[in-house]
């Protein structure tokens, strides 16, 4: 069985037969429109976000499987607080504020893909991502929020 794996980032629910998908899948001998349709059905819940997708093609049988990953934490943060873009100057300009409840929700979604061994540390990773997006956490800078997590201020969210 000759298996080819194509990994791409697509906009949730809006994959097309054009680049980057079409040129990567076309030569493998499967119906591109079927692949696009399956990807769009599987990613429609992530509309407006970049979603990692893995297309596994069996070139002998001309069949395919689609595996959808979880969008990057930055995309989940922006969707959760309802903004399209983060701050242009993340350390100087705040693009929005996120609650610890929302942080924990994102951490639970991403936990399997993270190196953190518990929800508290996974949440700290998500808070760390807030630095690069320019988002405050409960009105604090992300570094202040991480110190507050370490101090136990938000422990009620992790039980």
Swiss-Prot record:
Q: Name one GO molecular function term.
A: large ribosomal subunit rRNA binding
| Record-linked InterPro entries | Ribosomal_uL11 (IPR000911), Ribosomal_uL11_C (IPR020783), Ribosomal_uL11_C_sf (IPR036769), Ribosomal_uL11_CS (IPR020785), Ribosomal_uL11_N (IPR020784), Ribosomal_uL11_N_sf (IPR036796)
Q: Which SMART domains match?
A: RL11 (SM00649)
Sorted UniProt keywords = Ribonucleoprotein, Ribosomal protein, RNA-binding, rRNA-binding
Q: Name one GO biological process term.
A: translation
This protein's GO cellular component annotations are: large ribosomal subunit
- What CDD domains does the annotation carry? Ribosomal_L11
SUPFAM superfamilies per the record? Answer: Ribosomal L11/L12e N-terminal domain (SSF54747), Ribosomal protein L11, C-terminal domain (SSF46906)
**Which domain of life does this protein belong to?**
Archaea
Pfam families per the UniProt record, alphabetical: Ribosomal_L11 (PF00298), Ribosomal_L11_N (PF03946)
Provide the family line: Belongs to the universal ribosomal protein uL11 family.
Quote the subunit structure annotation.
Part of the ribosomal stalk of the 50S ribosomal subunit. Interacts with L10 and the large rRNA to form the base of the stalk. L10 forms an elongated spine to which L12 dimers bind in a sequential fashion forming a multimeric L10(L12)X complex.
So what does this one do? Forms part of the ribosomal stalk which helps the ribosome interact with GTP-bound translation factors.
Q: What is this protein called?
A: Large ribosomal subunit protein uL11
Species: Methanococcus maripaludis (strain DSM 14266 / JCM 13030 / NBRC 101832 / S2 / LL)
Q: Identify the taxonomic lineage of the organism of origin.
A: Archaea, Methanobacteriati, Methanobacteriota, Methanomada group, Methanococci
Q: Which gene encodes it?
A: rpl11
